[in-house]
Amino acid sequence: MELTPREKDKLLIFTAALLAERRKARGVKLNYPESIAYITATIMEGARDGKTVAELMGEGRTLLKRQDVMEGVPEMIHEVQVEATFPDGTKLVTVHDPIV
């Protein structure tokens, strides 16, 4: 199977997000890379489902709370930018202060 670098990146993000999702479900606090992957994958999947950029920007702020992540992680993540594939093309989704 031949994959482009972009496709490989998407698979890596999805794998990290799956791990983060399982850890979150067990009550394990997420670290920085897991938090980024969790938010990014949710945005990417929402785009594929046909949600709008505005919907995803709002949803991105509701995914993680301070109690879901390790100490200091919310202060490290000021924004998450995702180039997501929507039914009508690729768009940049920016989520400001995603962990409340």
Curated annotation (Swiss-Prot):
GO annotation (BP), single: urea catabolic process
First-level EC class: hydrolase
Localization terms from the record: Cytoplasm
Entry's Gene Ontology molecular function annotations: nickel cation binding; urease activity
EC number: 3.5.1.5
Pathway: Nitrogen metabolism; urea degradation; CO(2) and NH(3) from urea (urease route): step 1/1
InterPro entries per the UniProt record, alphabetical: Urease_gamma (IPR012010), Urease_gamma/gamma-beta_su (IPR002026), Urease_gamma_sf (IPR036463), Urease_subunit (IPR050069)
Keyword terms of this UniProt record: Cytoplasm, Hydrolase
Database matches in CDD domains: Urease_gamma
Cellular compartments per GO CC: cytoplasm
Reactions that this protein is recorded to catalyse: urea + 2 H2O + H(+) = hydrogencarbonate + 2 NH4(+)
Principal location: cytoplasm
Subunit (UniProt): Heterotrimer of UreA (gamma), UreB (beta) and UreC (alpha) subunits. Three heterotrimers associate to form the active enzyme.
Homology family: Belongs to the urease gamma subunit family.
Listed PANTHER family: UREASE
Identification of the protein by name: Urease subunit gamma
